[in-house]
């Protein structure tokens, strides 16, 4: 009846094990409305100058500067030696060229030169041009050499490995001639394209007269766009050749393929690197040029100006040569991490280092 106790089992404690704490080793589940303590993903491994994942623009540029900080003896030593040789040769060439021009000046001023004098003047002008051209060619070769050396240092530095000059040269030596061939092929191709473009514009001018202005502008603009497009697509051909050990044509194909879908990004990074190197060069050369101008004001000799030009070339080269090459090398590595998941291979290489510091970059057939 009313007020009687409930039947047995009603309201009693639950059976053993029901609602009790779990046995040791089992975690309790979170209550309703509670969330598990999710944290941020672990950072990407960074054994060297950049993290092993697709890079942001700032990380790429900072990595180029970090190359100098990570191995200053080798990087700055190579840059100093190569820049010194280039500066000395170009300074001598400029001095000899100016001396030839001084010798030709009296004939040009008189205006009454004989045929023999005009011939001598033309020969002097040709000698002046050659005096500047030959050092410029050697300086170009030295720049190609520096680019290859610094690209190798970048590839090793990404994995946290520091190479000395001998190790770097041993890796580059069998790739130097192909690297020179690649540079010449691209340069000759660009020169030929410009020559064809100029020939078309001149032909339009002869054929259409004043009406050739608009077609000529269209040809010039179209040719310039095509050259810039090809330059960006081939921007990482040198790193592909040096690091992967492929041939000249294969390196151009590799660069063209890696830049697919990233053309605007590659262009932006190249422009940004160019602006930075230009600013660095200006900061270095302007004070030297000002001092040389003041020194020239107290002397009629051109020697202070020539020496200042050589010194500016030397100092600017020490800074800009490794930075420019490092940007190109890191851009190549970044493109491969984005398209080919190279970062996974590099992580494995960091765990199991090999005698060849660039072995992780070789593509497996």
Kindly give the residue locations of the regions a language model identified.
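Intrinsically disordered, low-complexity Pro/Gly-rich regions
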Residues: 1-51, 354-365
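N-terminal membrane-targeting/anchoring modules of bacterial envelope and secretion proteins
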Residues: 26, 31, 37-111, 115-119, ...
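Juxtamembrane transition segments at transmembrane-helix termini in multipass membrane proteins
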Residues: 31-34, 234-243, 270-365
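Selective recognition of hydrophobic, aromatic-rich stretches within alpha-helical transmembrane segments
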Residues: 37-51, 125-164, 211-251, 303-339
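Nonpolar helix-loop interface/hinge motif
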Residues: 43-98, 225-303
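Membrane-embedded alpha-helical bundles of multi-pass transporters/translocases
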Residues: 63, 67, 174-186, 258, ...
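Residue-level signature of the transmembrane alpha-helical core
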Residues: 80, 84, 137, 180, ...
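Membrane-helix interface segments in multi-pass membrane proteins
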Residues: 89-136, 194-227, 281-320
